[in-house]
Amino acid sequence: QGGWPRNPIPP
């Protein structure tokens, strides 16, 4: 769970 550029991990 993520969201570029806040979280560099894949959704």
From Swiss-Prot:
The keyword Metal-binding does not apply. It comes from Crotalus adamanteus. This is Bradykinin-potentiating peptide 11b. GO terms for cellular component: extracellular region. This peptide both inhibits the activity of the angiotensin-converting enzyme (ACE) and enhances the action of bradykinin by inhibiting the peptidases that inactivate it. It acts as an indirect hypotensive agent. Keywords: Hypotensive agent, Metalloenzyme inhibitor, Metalloprotease inhibitor, Protease inhibitor, Pyrrolidone carboxylic acid, Secreted, Toxin. It comes from the Eukaryota. GO terms for molecular function: peptidase inhibitor activity; toxin activity. Its main location: secreted.
